[in-house]
Amino acid sequence: DEMKKVTDVLMRHPQVHVLTDDIYEHLVYGDFKFVTPAQVEPNLIDRTLTMNGVSKAYAMTGWRIGYCAGPLPLIEAMTNIQSQSTSNPTSISQVAAETGLNGDQGFIREMVKAFIARQLKG
């Protein structure tokens, strides 16, 4: 419902682009359902840039593995800038990230349960 309100405003302003940072997409509590603006309003896909990575959900903080999806011209421009300003992550980090993203996701629920328990202990 909240995201729908946001996307309704965005649809009234076609000059506004959307940048989402979805790094916590898997670490949600209770009955909260993670959704992106483009999932709620598919007409936003052409002006949405979605960033994500493995540092939070896959406990790979500091490994500097992230990814982005969006309109091809923007991704190409980002690739040109990124390739000139940073170095590549190590191959072992890349393999670990791929394994995390493609493997069983059940452990994430266990992490969320542990986080909730810590919060309750306060």
What are these regions (language model features)?
Residues 1-15, 24-60, 72-73:
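Active-site pre-lysine segment of PLP-dependent enzymes
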Residues 21:
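Glycine-centered flexible beta-alpha turn that most often forms the glycine-rich phosphate-binding loop
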Residues 27, 119-122:
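Alpha-helix capping/termination and helix-coil
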Residues 41-116, 120:
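Conserved core segment of the aminotransferase class I/II
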